[in-house]
Design a protein with these regions (language model features):
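Polytopic alpha-helical membrane-helix bundles and their juxtamembrane interface segments
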Residues: 1-41, 50-157
Length: 157
């Protein structure tokens, strides 16, 4: 696939790393094994996609089996994380969560994260083609900034 470079794979690794660190921080506070499994599954999905792009960039081999599980693995991971919050609802100090989310500057980072993820959803639905390197660059830059905003929001909370 033309235009899939090592640089694109490395940029794709930024949101995976930012999201992974953010999930480790949340998992440490939540302490739910279900959340940890969901977070690990979501991060593993991202790592598979980064590996796919790295192999494309270095050896020009399209190992689609590394890319195909991304959406189902990520969705399953997000579902497990959501279920962990429902199951542990009474154990979570929601006042502290709300206070952290609404604190400055965390609130700005969380608003930016939500806005960027919304924009990414729109972009993927209306403009994105998986085989288009330019579209992948755009999506990865949006995602890298967005997931870094999530991480910064959590760090400042």
């Amino acid at each position: 696939m033309e235009g899939f470079t090592v640089g694109l794979a490395l940029v794709d690794a930024i949101p995976v790393l930012s999201f992974g660190i953010a999930m480790v921080i949340i998992a440490g506070k939540v302490g739910s094994p279900l959340f940890m499994v969901g977070a690990a599954l979501s991060v593993l999905a991202g790592c598979c996609k980064v590996a796919w792009k790295l192999i494309l960039g270095i050896w020009k081999k399209d190992l689609r089996w590394l890319n195909k599980p991304f959406v189902p693995m990520q969705a399953a991971g997000f579902l497990l994380m959501a279920i962990s919050f429902v199951v542990g609802f009474g154990k979570i100090n929601w006042a502290a969560v709300g206070s952290g989310i609404l604190s400055f500057p965390s609130a700005l980072f969380f608003v930016a994260w939500i806005g960027l993820m919304g924009f990414m959803g729109w972009f993927r639905k209306h403009k994105f083609k998986n085989e288009d390197a330019k579209a992948n660059w755009t999506a990865q830059i949006i995602n890298a900034v967005g997931q870094t905003c999530l991480l910064l929001g959590i760090l400042f909370a």
